[in-house]
Regions:
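Structural preference for beta-rich elements and adjacent junctions enriched in aromatics
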Residues: 22-241
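Short, Lys/Arg-enriched N-terminal segments with co-localized hydrophobic residues
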Residues: 7-23
Length: 241
């Protein structure tokens, strides 16, 4: 009987994993041909010029946190760097984390997680940036993360429409924009040369753990009982041109 129960559980898990794989969201990340981008503030204009469309971060995965700010993002790459642009409207904003690798997820925060091809299934990178441009970069598996050092962090160009100084929570509706230029060299656990034709997986998030109205939104849906973004099993497919 125990053997049959184990077989049934295994079949169920295989079916669920297969359904998840077939249901994975997909994003094509176009290559844009620009010389070195000297400032992240240029990114929105570049993506406008290249007609890169916005995607919504709109999955509310946990009914205990129903608030859904308006969040859009778009992504492209230059070969040796990923360009990200977020546009967000929410009830309040906060940027208390004053240093890189701080608790930016407690602030108004936009995030990008990615698993590189050929890496171990449980390993992935997380790039988390608050609305004042403070950045956290981590790598490894859930519960065993290594933070990036000063050089990979400094290599990421950031721009926020709210400036770069920390501030306490500001109440009232606020629309803000964030842009990042993430070079291949900031993937500090790899000797990554470029993103050309890369087939990766990942997810895009918006959170604010300590805002007056906490929220946890994702681009690709997450089927877990409690808020958790560190879940590569629910990443979508990322196709780099």
């Amino acid at each position: 009987m125990v053997i049959w129960i184990s077989v049934i559980i295994l079949i169920y898990l295989c079916i669920k994993i297969n359904l998840l794989m077939n249901d994975m969201k997909e994003l094509s990340i176009a290559k844009v041909n620009f010389p070195e981008i000297t400032s992240a503030e240029l990114v929105p204009g570049i993506l406008d010029q290249c007609h890169i469309p916005f995607q919504e971060i709109a999955c509310v995965n946990w009914k205990e946190y129903p608030y859904q700010p308006a969040v859009r993002f778009r992504a492209a790459h230059t070969g040796d760097a990923i360009l990200l642009n977020y546009r967000i409207t929410e009830k309040s904003v906060r940027a208390v984390a004053s240093e890189d690798n701080g608790s930016v997820w407690e602030d108004a925060c936009a995030e990008f997680f990615i698993q590189l091809p050929g890496d171990k299934k449980e390993n992935y990178y997380n790039f988390e940036c608050n609305c004042a441009g403070k950045l956290l970069i981590g790598y490894g598996k859930q519960g065993d993360r290594t933070h990036a050092g000063s050089e990979p962090l400094a290599g990421v160009k950031r721009w926020s429409s709210l400036g770069n100084q920390p501030f306490e929570e500001r109440m009232g509706e606020c629309s803000w924009e964030l842009a990042l230029v993430i070079p291949a060299s900031s993937f500090f656990a790899h000797q990554l040369k470029d993103f050309n034709h890369m087939e990766a997986t990942g997810n895009f998030y918006k959170c604010g753990d300590k805002l007056e109205t906490p929220h946890f939104l994702s681009w690709a849906p997450i089927d877990l009982p409690a808020p958790c973004f560190h879940c590569p099993d629910f990443f979508g497919k990322l196709h780099f041109e």
